[in-house]
Amino acid sequence: MSIRVLIADDSAVMRDAIARTLNADPALEVVGEAASFAETLKQASTLNPDIVLLDLHMPDESRYLPEIVKGPLLENTGCILAISVWNDEEAKSLAKNIGAVALLDKAHLSSDLISSIKMYCMKD
């Protein structure tokens, strides 16, 4: 049985790169992609992914991020991994507030993604 992943990033190029990386591992299955927080909430509630890879900064963040912080995303997924181009204290705090288990730097995503998923989200 594969681990179901929802990719949430406003960049189609980034979503495609992440999907290619994940699809190279037979234990992982990309079940959906979202380009906004609104889409992420909707898809998470219908797809019930095991993992959500969530970009912290998308165009509709001011409207939906407070809603995400309240926890509805966690109700529909087992693990949130935040991704961002920023790794400052503000980003780390935001990742923690939304219930993410870790904040991954987009600059190192290709080398860190699979190992981070296995470390933080895959239970034996």
Predicted feature locations:
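Conserved acidic segment of CheY-like receiver
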Residues: 2-14, 18, 22
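Receiver (REC) domain switch/output surface
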Residues: 25, 113-124
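Acidic, metal-coordinating helix/loop segments flanking the phosphotransfer/catalytic sites
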Residues: 33-51
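Active-site residues of response regulator receiver
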Residues: 55-57
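Short amphipathic alpha-helix used as the core "switch/output" element in two-component signaling
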Residues: 62-76
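Alpha4 helix (beta4-alpha4-beta5 surface) of REC/receiver domains from two-component response regulators
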Residues: 63, 86-104, 115
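Hydrophobic/aromatic residues positioned on beta-strands within the core alpha/beta folds
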Residues: 82-83
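Receiver (REC) domain switch/active-site region of two-component response regulators
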Residues: 109
